[in-house]
Amino acid sequence: MKKSDGLIILSPDNCELHEQLCRLPLSSGKPCYVDKTFAPDEASAKRVFAVAEASGTPCWSTSALRFAEEYAQIDPSKVVAINSWGPNDFEIYAIHQLEPLMMLMQSRPQRVMALKTDAWYLLTIEFEDGRCASVSGYEHGSPFVMNINSKTGSTVLEVKSDFFHRFILGLVQFFRTKRAPVPHEETVAIMALREAGQKALTVPGQWVNV
């Protein structure tokens, strides 16, 4: 770490390891990126960020989908509701839907309810300002698509742009400026939503508080 200008912490399919893996990097004072999924739950996310904040280490985490060009055309202040769908396996792939959804809704989720079969799930999300959104996953795969209802109409977006390239540009910019493009509190809220979503999938048809 001493010879590094910036650090990347990778454990993409085992986010429960991030808290342990982040202890030294996030105490180093050097800019750090933690790969998605940031943490398994809200409490762990808060603990990880607390280490960085105590040492003054710039850090952030995101799904690369946040950088898709398609989302840039949407004015978050006009969003009324969102339907999002993508691949199945909530534990691994849901972050790629939750991240852009939270970026566009710009409100704190209050509670969630799930329905599911062996091949599909639907997660309904109610936000504290009364708006709602949904996330669906499909066993045999799906492109990342959103139907966004706004005050001016409805827009269907399918992600086809080179979002990973745009993400890398954002990552390089972060290492240069040490300014995180995603606030810690937003990432914590996304982890809280993911945690509640996982609980909701175990009790279909029941509301679970975030």
Question: For each predicted feature, which ranges?
Answer:
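C-terminal helix-rich "cap/oligomerization" subdomain common to oxidoreductases
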Residues: 3-13, 174-210
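Glycine-centered short loops/turns at secondary-structure junctions
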Residues: 29, 56, 204-205
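A contiguous active-site-proximal alpha/beta segment in oxidoreductase catalytic domains
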Residues: 32-33, 38-97
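Rossmann-like dinucleotide-binding domain that binds NAD(P)(H)
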Residues: 80-143, 185-192
